[in-house]
Amino acid sequence: DTIEARVLKRPQIYQPANASYHDKQPSAQASSQPAARPLDDTKILGTIVHQPIPFRKWAIFCLEKDVHHGEYLNDRFYELSEERRFDIYVDYGDIVELSNKSGIEAFKEAIDDYYLKYVCGKDANGRQLTKPRKTKDLYFFLIIMPDSIKQEHLYTALKNKINTDSPVISQFVSSKTIQKYNDRIYINILRQINAKLGGDLWRLNFGAEISRKTMLVGIDVCHKGKQSIIGFCATYDEHMCKYYTQASPQGQKGQEIISSGVLQEYFKSAFQAFRDHNQGQLPDHIFIYRDGVGDSMRAQVIAHELEQLTKIVQQEYCLDPSKEPALPKHTLIIVNKRVRQRFFQVGANAGISNP
């Protein structure tokens, strides 16, 4: 079958011209004169760091037998920074050494002690030693996972611990990964940390077809084990690189429809994040990608969740009764993994190609 359709222009990847953040300050020329390259130029994806974040205060946690790996990683991060491979400034991190017999609890205690001393300015007994610092002054923790502890258990326990009690970005690396002595691996680790700290790796130029005040929303319900978990993610900047995220358990296992209160609260918070970032303005177009919907529940989910979006939009966009509200357009896209149809573009000579 043949249908009429519109083929949008291929997006371009922005890359700052002559960018250099090595001196810890962004170049004015780099931010004001971005260059763009075609999206299919994949060679640049591994080298671009559009918004570098300087790594100043950070710490490595490892067993005594892995200290030399931590020292090597510390040196290599700094040397890669000096070589200006990707314009991220990396200072030397502290190395916190644990005995080789240490288990998960010992790692937790070491993280607690370091956070208490550096951020809170207290010793292990709670006595104030120095003036407290802000959490944001501590950039991230890097944990070298030893072979002697089951890595899945260590990762889960420490990730939950850090997120709950020590709100600091964390990165986990196995000792085997460091022993590969591959700069490409180390660069990827730095880029992952940069992204976790809020620095954009690359940005897309969407052209005039997409409004600068567009919010992109992803919603999924994951069913695993005894729980069903809601995942919610919404962009709030014009480049669609900054995200508001939330996750919470459903009321019962297998439940696909998200309750009214939860969904409205998520959208309300996402709109507030957009408002805070855009001088009080709200999106004029909302794209929603809804995943995790079975065929049997699709109609109910669409009807229920669109109704909740309409309600919260009416509340958020009609705050001033003296003004006529400019309600946003919204586009709902249901993600279906079981798709057999394929679409091709018909060329001038009746040849077909991917659009």
Q: Which residue stretches match the model-derived regions?
A:
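Long, low-complexity, intrinsically disordered terminal regions
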Residues: 1-355
